[in-house]
Amino acid sequence: MTSNILLLLHPTVVTDQHIVENIKLKISNTHKDFHLSQTTIDRLTQGSIEFDNNSFDEIIYINPNEEQYREIPNSLMKLIFDLLKLNGKFTGDLPTDQNLDVLMNGFLIINQNEWNKPQPEETVVTLKKKSTTTNNNSNTSTIKKSFPMFKKLNNDNASTPGLTDSSAGTSEDETATVSNKRKLVESKLVYFSDDDDDDDYDGSSDGEDLINENDLIAESNKYKIIVPKKCELPNGKKRKKACKDCTCGLKELEEEEIKSQGKLQDTVLANMAQSATIEAIKIEERMKKNKIKFTEEDLSEIDFTVAGKTGGCGSCSLGDAFRCDGCPFLGLPPFKPGEVVRID
């Protein structure tokens, strides 16, 4: 049977021209009847070349890089899984630090250089046994399991607890529980009890056993409600700053005001920075347009002793009070143009 084999090449294979030739030679020695295809990772992932799913018995990955640089993306791993047939193999230069991704994509790790696409196992569903029927004289009867019957407690027998088994006696704990329930009913606190047992209440009790909610509200009005004091001074003026334990809401108002001021300042600074950037760009553009060009006469050395020749500031011969910081005549007395000045 012909085996379909795919050579999946990493782009760095071009660094060694003998790698692919050696792999093909090994394949020809180990396989008698095979059909070999070859492509690169980038062409496969970009869709430049397409293969049918479940079309390859083996995919060989060639990556000459070191182990820490052999990572395979999940998208490529899933694509390789789809191209392999059932029980197909993915071999070659595989990464060793992606075991979780390999298992999540459906592969089984056989060894360090081989992953396998397993064949799914058939699931076995256990069917429920149907109810048996007996036929007697064309009369069909279905055998059904009977459930135990329980006796419901009546209001007349509320003083004694109802038992499902007449042979069981009444324990001390059950007696105490029944007496506590009876006390709750007498004190009209059943409405507030969190007992989920509906045996004692079957919906037939009168409304007198329940407490009216309006009565509870009326009773709560008797208690004095604590109202927080306003942050006001004795003279009637309002406080400029909230107290340490403020409860009137002034502290929250101050915090909101501080936040609004901060946002306003951030907006102003951002606008200023933006305008400064725009102005700097305009200045730079103007400087590029107005280029300063010096002639040969401007670039030649200036002799301050010759009449008509002056420095850039034109004040070198007037004295130190008029000379620049880097003037070579600093410290010398004033001189006239044409006068010989020597600097020792």
Swiss-Prot record:
Name of the gene: DRE2
Keywords: 2Fe-2S, 4Fe-4S, Cytoplasm, Iron, Iron-sulfur, Metal-binding, Mitochondrion
Chain intervals for the UniProt region annotation (Fe-S binding site A): 231-248
GO biological process, one term: cellular response to oxidative stress
Described purpose of this protein according to its UniProt entry: Component of the cytosolic iron-sulfur (Fe-S) protein assembly (CIA) machinery required for the maturation of extramitochondrial Fe-S proteins. Part of an electron transfer chain functioning in an early step of cytosolic Fe-S biogenesis, facilitating the de novo assembly of a [4Fe-4S] cluster on the scaffold complex CFD1-NBP35. Electrons are transferred to DRE2 from NADPH via the FAD- and FMN-containing protein TAH18.
Signal peptide bounds: none
Residue ranges of the region described as Linker: 161-223
Record-given protein name: Fe-S cluster assembly protein DRE2
Cell compartment(s), UniProt: Cytoplasm; Mitochondrion intermembrane space
Motif stretch (Cx2C motif 2): 324-327
Subunit record text: Monomer. Interacts with TAH18. Interacts with MIA40.
